[in-house]
């Protein structure tokens, strides 16, 4: 039941953010391949698990970013549903948004190809062993942690749109 509540809350935040018309900050001054190399392990695992439902190859940044809001929402929900550490959870949608913003600026075929190769390698090397699995001794703490992740990732998604 609590998981459904988290999903509904996150989806509501994303829907509200989609209606917002405020300007967002420009992406960082990092290159597209540089951003692809900074994708946290947790986000890479999510991309590996989500790319087929999005309809793109995992390293096809242009395809993944065609529906930026949907990609950010799906990555955010995946991160919230996993046991990612707080830092990865809070930066997950920022890095995806920044990559898609740079793709939208059409940096050229060579840059996109390079970034796609980097992202493909990052996703291929991502492991689930670094992601904490819940145990009976930490379950209560994880509930509070999950609530914090919902708020942080939801806020990041709201800014991304």
Curated annotation (Swiss-Prot):
Domain CFEM: 24-126
GO MF annotation: an example: metal ion binding
Heme among keywords: yes
Name under which the protein is recorded: Effector CFEM5
Job of this protein: Suppresses host programmed cell death during infection by binding to Z.mays WAK17 isoform 2 and Z.mays LRR5, to prevent activation of Z.mays WAK17 isoform 1 and the downstream hypersensitive response.
Chief place where the protein resides: membrane
Superkingdom of this protein's organism: Eukaryota
Keywords in alphabetical order: Disulfide bond, Glycoprotein, GPI-anchor, Heme, Iron, Lipoprotein, Membrane, Metal-binding, Secreted, Signal
Domain notes for this protein: The CFEM domain mediates interactions with host proteins.
Binding site for heme: 60
Subcellular location: Membrane; Secreted
Subunit field text: Interacts with Z.mays LRR5; the interaction is direct. Interacts with Z.mays WAK17 isoform 2; the interaction is direct.
